[in-house]
Amino acid sequence: MKQTMVMEKYPVSELSIVKNETTFTSADDIINEIKSKIDAHPVAVYIATFDHYAHTKSLGENGMISNDILDAKNLICCFGKALPEANMVAVRPRSIGVVEMENEFVVSFLDAPNPQAHETMIQWVKSIKNK
């Protein structure tokens, strides 16, 4: 995993996986694998899958997709098991982005404030590189 700063203020964990380093063949396959890990987790709950590619494409001239990107989806989930203060809802739920390119997948997420949730997402993402 590498750490990057998106727009100079958002800490993101990201893993690029060359397609020959995984048995998964599409963004949907990866989303389904991570969803199965969420379903098996004692706290995490699956919320939705957002087809970011389809949404952006539907915007016509108002949308822009890099020619490198073949598919882009976000899996939305939540690890919240406590609400100690009102502003905690601002950092939830979590989103794991899966982008398919010609020769690789890029899987990324905004760093989580909860260290256990963050480590769990790192392990889920790393498990995609399974060859």
Task: Describe the function of each predicted region.
Residues N32-A86:
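Ser/Thr-rich, low-complexity intrinsically disordered terminal regions
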Residues S95-D111:
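Beta-strand/loop substructures that line and gate deep hydrophobic ligand-binding cavities in soluble
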Residues A86-N87, V99:
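Short active-site-adjacent structural elements
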Residues T4-K9, I65-S66, S95-E100:
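Short, flexible, solvent-exposed loop/turn segments with mixed acidic/basic and small polar residues
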Residues M1-P42:
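Terminal, regulation- and interaction-focused segments at domain boundaries
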Residues T22-D29, E85-A86, A117-E119:
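Short, conserved charged micro-motifs
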